[in-house]
Amino acid sequence: MPKTSYAWHELTLTLSTNTDPTSAQFALTNAANSVYEKYRKEIDHQHAVLERVMDTAFPKPQPGTKWQFTDAGLELVLRYPVVIEHAEEIDDQMTREVMRVVATNSQLKASLSGTPKLRAAIRA
């Protein structure tokens, strides 16, 4: 979209099925929000430009989570907007904060199955 330069990225974590989804979601959403707060104003500005150009109101971009079942277990998808010019830095900060939360939360750490994955979110 002209005059906007943000996209969506996802960080996925596979957790065992005995994970408490509510506490895991709460902890990881808080982690994402703490990183997002550092660049939220830039996303909000671009969002406002998009609304003016399109002459339509859209929900403000913000981090969110969803659960899905996979063959490997229960997958938590943490989706967040990134400023394209700073996407690598934002992904690094997001990964570090999520891993810090996992490392300091014994239940979450014990339920982590496999390696977290980072990807650009492309939706049809």
Predicted regions and their residues:
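A membrane-cytosol interface segment of integral membrane proteins
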Residues: 1-41
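Solvent-exposed, non-transmembrane regulatory segments of membrane-associated proteins
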Residues: 19, 29-124
